[in-house]
Amino acid sequence: LKINPYEGVIKVFGKDLKKIKKKELYRTMGIVFQNPANQFITQNVLDEVKQSIRLWNNKLSDEEVNNEALKRLDEYGLLRYKRYSPYMLSQGQQRRLAVLSVLAGEQKILLLDEPTYGQDYRSTCAIMSLLEDKIKTKGLSVILITHDEELAKSYADKRYVVRGNGVYEA
């Protein structure tokens, strides 16, 4: 992650970004890649979610982790695919799995690159509703990258447009 302001200071949780150790920053940040298949690390969908839960909640028993993973898969409409390889899912299902896996953690900042691309209206609303809930209940900051201007208008507190070599407030 390399962000250097032309002037001024970038602060994350009140600290100058240049003075934050990378490891500390990465522990507070969750990322969903534009191509979600690039972030999967396990052999099946259930294990993918369990891995994320365990990473952030290592005090839970195996049974608790399994139950929580099954509950979350059900919420996202992915329960019937629990034994599938993540790579066997459709692009939209992979995207939901990636978002689900990231939300399993205790991050304070989420960077989501096109999390609703390829989703139908219902799935888009479900993902965005879940994000809104996490923002309200956990105080998350979300940086959402999208080409969907209507989505950005509907959900964002602040919007910026990247054009040419500049970043402009929308």
What are these regions (language model features)?
Residues 146-147:
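H-loop/switch region of ABC-family ATPase nucleotide-binding domains
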Residues 102-103:
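ABC ATPase C-loop
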Residues 62-81:
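Conserved ABC ATPase "signature" region
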Residues 110-113:
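Catalytic Walker B motif of ABC-type/P-loop ATPase nucleotide-binding domains
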